[in-house]
């Protein structure tokens, strides 16, 4: 897995999208999550899809953090009260040629008073 963002304390992530810029060759799915769940945000984005394809915008593509099936999120988001977590991206197989992907993170910052 590759760390793509050190998530600051006081962050709420409401959505993560992966957009294919340059398709990879071979086979492989990209997953996006954090230190606790490697596909908590995006379950499986086809790394060989056409340029411009977006993943994480459909119900079948989002992980448990957005679907609210895990106790660590409230509503349809994940809260990070403390620092020390990273947003991570991984590929489930080795591609012959790597894909180029933009990752877009949507959310809020807050001051935790806990």
Language model feature labels by segment:
Residues 1-114:
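Surface-exposed, low-hydrophobicity beta-strand/loop segments enriched in small/polar/acidic residues
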